[in-house]
């Protein structure tokens, strides 16, 4: 019986679970010879919610069938403009990877090996966006790691196992989910070997990191401190098997096309050899001819290249592609700014000439699609600053002179047009 006699003969009631008295809690609910307080009820609800959220969700693929390569490609088309061959390669590789995971339990003589992916393409060509879209489509845990921040274990910097720690954090430390997630390692080209010859000095952020990543990529038991703490000898670690994690590595690989051209020019000598000069060939066209030996020459170790068998190259985005990126994807920049202005009950019109000017500016800056937002933000800054305090504005028009810095947005009032910043 959850009751006790007090000194003043008052019969006190106590929670049968936590032992708190009726005076220490807001509410005490009675059952057959037991009591439960409001705090314990809240705790029970929280436990049930957490268990329900994770029940049966080993991966995001358990609720529905794995989409076909064509379906994966169609969804990528909604978010990523251009890069058709890269999207096809990724769709097939990801489909095969998760098809393999769904049949892991079946005993067979043939063991399917994992196909990790290497994306090669200039800055702002869509490498990260492709990986993000794939993870969102498949509803699996996803993390982006920057290879330039990684160092060998024991040196100042991030240990490669920190990548798995972040993946665990992104799925609330559910190990089964993390073991079927996607890891995107950016700037992989920046940890290339500094030279072909081994150096006396330790290359802690180059070949050493490649060796450390190799173990992670091919499959190992990574030891991760619980809840993001730092490693020390007297603590228990969470063990995560990386064998079934899909690793996608990406990099710009500046200078790789020269390595490829040097190789192809050496082999292309004599009658019947291609006479197309390297000046006539687009960088993207050259990169499509990449071979493992070119990547080794660039500075990646052969063992790591062997663990990244699927190679997809992305081309530089031209003016037309950048203009499409501004307006066509589901989350296109222009659509986002339309929504922002609609919240102020104002219509935003960005004219085709302005879109062309934005694309030209991004090409000049060599930032690709990544630089589009900063250009548009800069052009709209003044009007977004002034608009909330203005009365009667119904429309804002952006033309190419605004993007080029030679003019200001045109504001259409309910009675007459004005230029932003004018009184």
Curated annotation (Swiss-Prot):
It comes from Paraburkholderia phymatum (strain DSM 17167 / CIP 108236 / LMG 21445 / STM815) (Burkholderia phymatum). ATP binds at residues 122-129. SMART domains: AAA (SM00382), ClpB_D2-small (SM01086), zf-C4_ClpX (SM00994). Keywords: ATP-binding, Chaperone, Metal-binding, Nucleotide-binding, Zinc. SUPFAM superfamilies: Glucocorticoid receptor-like (DNA-binding domain), P-loop containing nucleoside triphosphate hydrolases. Zn(2+) binds at residues 15, 18, 37, 40. This is ATP-dependent Clp protease ATP-binding subunit ClpX. Component of the ClpX-ClpP complex. Forms a hexameric ring that, in the presence of ATP, binds to fourteen ClpP subunits assembled into a disk-like structure with a central cavity, resembling the structure of eukaryotic proteasomes. The keyword GTP-binding does not apply. Residues 3-56 form the ClpX-type ZB domain. Transmembrane segments: none annotated. GO terms for molecular function: ATP binding; ATP hydrolysis activity; ATP-dependent protein folding chaperone; protein dimerization activity; unfolded protein binding; zinc ion binding. Belongs to the ClpX chaperone family. NCBIfam families: clpX (TIGR00382), PRK05342.1 (NF003745). PANTHER family: ATP-DEPENDENT CLP PROTEASE ATP-BINDING SUBUNIT CLPX-LIKE, MITOCHONDRIAL, ATP-DEPENDENT CLP PROTEASE ATP-BINDING SUBUNIT CLPX-LIKE, MITOCHONDRIAL-RELATED. It comes from the Bacteria. ATP-dependent specificity component of the Clp protease. It directs the protease to specific substrates. Can perform chaperone functions in the absence of ClpP. One of its GO terms (biological process) is proteolysis involved in protein catabolic process. One of its GO terms (cellular component) is HslUV protease complex. InterPro entries: AAA+_ATPase, ATP-dep_Clp_protease_ClpX, ATPase_AAA_core, Clp_ATPase_C, Clp_protease_ATP-bd_su_ClpX, ClpX_bact, P-loop_NTPase, Znf_CppX_C4.
């Amino acid at each position: 019986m959850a009751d006790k006699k007090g000194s003043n003969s008052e019969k006190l009631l106590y929670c049968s679970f936590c032992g708190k008295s009726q005076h220490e809690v807001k509410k005490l609910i009675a059952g057959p010879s037991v009591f439960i307080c409001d705090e314990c009820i809240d705790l029970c609800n929280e436990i049930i919610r957490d268990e329900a959220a994770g029940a049966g969700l080993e991966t995001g693929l358990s609720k529905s069938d794995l989409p076909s390569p064509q379906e994966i490609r169609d969804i990528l088309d909604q978010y990523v403009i251009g890069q058709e061959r890269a999207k096809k390669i990724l769709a097939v590789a990801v489909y095969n990877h998760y098809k393999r995971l769904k049949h892991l339990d079946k005993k067979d003589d043939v063991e399917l090996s994992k196909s990790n992916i290497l994306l090669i393409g200039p800055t702002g060509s869509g490498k990260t966006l492709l990986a993000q879209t794939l993870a969102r489509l498949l509803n699996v845990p996803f993390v982006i790691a920057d290879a330039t921040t990684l160092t060998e274990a024991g040196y100042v910097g991030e240990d490669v196992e920190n990548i798995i720690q972040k993946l665990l954090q992104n799925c609330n430390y559910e190990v089964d989910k993390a073991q079927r997630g996607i890891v995107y390692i950016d700037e992989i080209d920046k940890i290339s070997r500094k030279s072909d010859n081994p150096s006396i000095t330790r290359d802690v952020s180059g070949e050493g990191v490649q060796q450390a990543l190799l173990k992670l990529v091919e499959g190992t038991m990574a030891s991760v401190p619980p809840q993001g703490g730092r490693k020390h000898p007297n603590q228990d670690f969470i063990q995560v098997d990386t064998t079934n994690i899909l690793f996608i590595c990406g990099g710009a690989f500046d200078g790789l096309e020269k390595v490829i051209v040097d190789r192809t020019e050496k082999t292309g000598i004599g009658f019947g050899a291609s006479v197309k000069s390297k000046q006539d060939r687009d960088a993207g066209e050259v990169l499509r001819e990449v071979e493992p030996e070119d990547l080794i020459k660039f500075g990646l170790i052969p063992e790591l290249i062997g663990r990244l068998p699927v190679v997809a190259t992305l081309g530089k985005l031209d003016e037309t592609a950048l203009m499409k990126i501004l307006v066509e994807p589901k989350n296109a920049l222009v659509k986002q700014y339309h929504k922002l202005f609609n919240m102020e009950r104002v219509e935003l019109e960005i004219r085709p000439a302005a879109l062309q000017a934005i694309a030209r500016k991004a090409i000049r800056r060599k930032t690709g699609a990544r630089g589009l937002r900063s250009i548009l933000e800069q052009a709209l800054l003044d009007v977004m600053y002034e608009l909330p305090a203005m009365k009667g504005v119904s429309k804002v028009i952006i033309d190419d002179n605004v993007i080029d810095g030679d003019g200001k947005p045109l504001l259409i009032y309910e009675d007459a047009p004005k230029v932003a910043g004018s009184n």
